[in-house]
C-alpha cells in the first residue's frame, strides 16, 4: 500500500533527498563521520552551510544586502524575536489572516508589557473563521512604524497572500513557513522573512531568517541568542546549530534547483497540483472548501469538509486505512486538510481525488 503523508508539518521530503542522506549517513563524503556527529566548526560543515546559503540565495534571488541566518526555535520564536529586535519604541502593525498571524500578534502584545513598543491589530478576519485575507486602509498606518507583519500562507485555513498590500511605505515582515519556495516573491519587497523548515525546506529544528542589513538591530538585545545582529555576524554559528537539519535543507535546495528547475517551475507545479483538487471540490456538491475568494487559495494547504461532522470523521478513518495519512483538519477548524507541499507527489492528489469520488458516491 502506498502511503501519502498529508501532514501540515513535519511534511513529506523529496525521495531523492532522503536517499542521498541515507547513502551519506554513516560516512559523509569520505570524512569517516556522519553529519550527525561532525563538528559545526569543521571544514566539511562549513562547506555545507555555505553551500546551503548560496543555493537559497540563488533560488530566491536574495540580494547581497540581505543576511541569511539559520536559527533554532521555530517560527514561533520569531514571534518574539521580531519585535524584540525591530520594534522598540515604535508602532508595529499586524495583519491577521489566520491562527498563526494571531499568535504572532498575541506574542507581540505580551512582549509590549516588558519592552516599550505598540503592537497594533491592522485588520483581522477572525470573525469569519479566517475564510479570507482581510483588507485595510493603508492611510491608517503610521509611516514611522517599525514594520507591518503578515503571514504569506495560512496553514490551518488554507489562504495565501500573493500580491503584497500597500503598507504606506512601512517595511514588511513576513512569516513564510508554509509557502516558501512554493510561490515566487521578490525578496526586496520585504525587510525580513522568516520560515520554519518543516514544510517546504527540511526537517523541523531549523528556521531560516532573511533580513535586510539596514534592518538589523543597533542595540544589544536581552539575549545574544535572540539578537539578529549577533547571529548574522556569527554566520549562524554563535552556538552549535542544528547541523543535520541544515544539511537536509541544503539537499532540498539542491533538489529544487537541479531536479525541479527553480522556484518559478516549482510554483507552476504547485498551482497545477493544487488546482486538480480545487477543481474537483468545485465540481462536487458533496465537498466544500471554506476559502471565500479563489484568488486567496493556498497552493500548499487545502481544507475541505463533507456535509456533516460525522461524515468528516468517517472520511478521515477510511482515508487513513487506505494510506492517506494525516488528512484530518486542524483541531480548531475540523474537517479535512490536504497539505500538498513541494515534495508531495502529484499522483497522491490524483489518488485522493479517486477516493473522494468513491466516498461521495457511497455516502451522498
From Swiss-Prot:
Cofactor note: Binds 1 pyridoxal phosphate per subunit.
Signal peptide positions on this chain: none
Catalytic function, reaction form: O-phospho-L-serine + 2-oxoglutarate = 3-phosphooxypyruvate + L-glutamate; 4-(phosphooxy)-L-threonine + 2-oxoglutarate = (R)-3-hydroxy-2-oxo-4-phosphooxybutanoate + L-glutamate
Subcellular location field: Cytoplasm
Residues that bear N6-(pyridoxal phosphate)lysine: 199
Gene3D superfamilies, per the entry: Aspartate Aminotransferase, domain 1, Type I PLP-dependent aspartate aminotransferase-like (Major domain)
Gene Ontology terms for molecular function: O-phospho-L-serine:2-oxoglutarate aminotransferase activity; pyridoxal phosphate binding
Keywords: Amino-acid biosynthesis, Aminotransferase, Cytoplasm, Pyridoxal phosphate, Pyridoxine biosynthesis, Serine biosynthesis, Transferase
Pfam family, one: Aminotran_5
EC number annotated for this UniProt entry: 2.6.1.52
Keyword Cytoplasm tagged: yes
GO biological process, one term: pyridoxine biosynthetic process
Cofactor: pyridoxal 5'-phosphate
InterPro entries: Aminotrans_V_dom, Pser_aminoTfrase, PyrdxlP-dep_Trfase, PyrdxlP-dep_Trfase_major, PyrdxlP-dep_Trfase_small
Pathway: Amino-acid biosynthesis; L-serine biosynthesis; L-serine from 3-phospho-D-glycerate: step 2/3
CC annotations in GO: cytoplasm
SUPFAM superfamilies given in the database record: PLP-dependent transferases
Residue numbers binding pyridoxal 5'-phosphate: 75-76, 100, 155, 198, 239-240
Quaternary structure annotation from Swiss-Prot or TrEMBL: Homodimer.
Chain's role: Catalyzes the reversible conversion of 3-phosphohydroxypyruvate to phosphoserine and of 3-hydroxy-2-oxo-4-phosphonooxybutanoate to phosphohydroxythreonine.
Family: Belongs to the class-V pyridoxal-phosphate-dependent aminotransferase family. SerC subfamily.
Alphabetical list of PANTHER family matching this protein: PHOSPHOSERINE AMINOTRANSFERASE
The name this protein goes by in its record: Phosphoserine aminotransferase
Gene: serC
Amino acid at each position: 500500500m502506498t502511503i501519502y503523508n498529508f501532514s501540515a508539518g513535519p511534511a513529506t521530503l523529496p525521495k531523492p533527498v532522503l536517499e542521498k542522506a541515507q547513502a551519506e549517513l554513516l560516512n559523509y563524503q569520505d570524512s569517516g563521520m556522519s553529519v550527525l556527529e561532525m563538528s559545526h566548526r569543521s571544514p566539511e560543515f562549513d562547506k555545507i552551510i555555505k553551500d546551503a546559503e548560496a543555493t537559497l540565495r540563488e533560488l530566491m534571488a536574495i540580494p547581497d544586502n540581505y543576511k541569511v541566518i539559520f536559527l533554532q526555535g521555530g517560527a514561533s520564536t520569531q514571534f518574539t524575536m521580531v519585535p524584540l529586535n525591530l520594534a522598540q519604541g515604535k508602532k508595529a502593525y499586524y495583519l491577521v489572516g489566520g491562527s498563526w498571524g494571531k499568535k504572532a500578534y498575541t506574542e507581540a502584545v505580551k512582549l509590549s508589557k516588558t519592552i516599550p513598543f505598540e503592537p497594533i491589530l491592522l485588520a483581522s478576519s477572525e470573525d469569519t473563521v479566517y475564510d479570507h485575507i482581510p483588507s485595510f486602509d493603508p492611510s491608517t498606518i503610521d509611516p514611522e512604524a517599525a514594520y507591518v507583519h503578515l503571514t504569506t500562507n495560512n496553514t490551518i485555513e488554507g489562504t495565501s497572500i500573493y500580491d503584497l498590500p500597500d503598507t504606506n511605505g512601512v517595511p514588511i515582515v513576513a512569516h513564510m513557513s508554509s509557502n516558501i519556495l512554493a510561490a515566487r516573491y521578490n525578496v526586496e519587497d520585504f525587510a525580513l522573512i522568516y520560515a520554519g523548515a518543516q514544510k517546504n525546506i527540511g526537517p523541523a529544528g531549523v528556521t531560516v531568517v532573511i533580513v535586510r542589513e539596514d534592518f538589523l538591530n543597533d542595540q544589544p538585545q536581552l539575549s545574544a541568542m535572540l539578537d539578529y545582529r549577533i547571529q548574522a555576524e556569527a554566520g549562524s554559528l554563535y552556538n552549535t546549530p542544528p547541523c543535520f537539519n541544515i544539511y537536509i535543507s541544503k539537499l532540498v535546495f539542491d533538489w529544487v534547483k537541479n531536479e525541479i528547475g527553480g522556484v518559478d517551475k516549482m510554483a507552476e507545479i504547485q498551482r497545477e497540483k493544487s488546482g486538480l483538487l480545487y477543481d474537483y471540490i468545485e465540481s462536487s456538491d458533496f465537498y466544500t472548501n471554506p476559502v471565500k475568494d479563489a484568488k486567496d487559495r493556498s497552493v500548499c494547504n487545502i481544507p475541505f469538509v463533507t456535509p456533516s461532522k460525522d461524515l468528516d470523521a468517517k472520511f478521515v478513518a477510511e482515508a487513513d486505512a487506505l494510506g492517506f495519512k494525516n488528512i484530518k483538519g486542524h483541531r480548531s477548524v475540523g474537517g479535512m486538510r490536504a497539505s500538498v507541499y513541494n515534495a508531495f507527489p502529484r499522483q497522491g492528489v490524483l489518488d485522493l481525488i479517486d477516493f473522494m469520488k468513491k466516498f461521495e458516491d457511497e455516502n451522498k
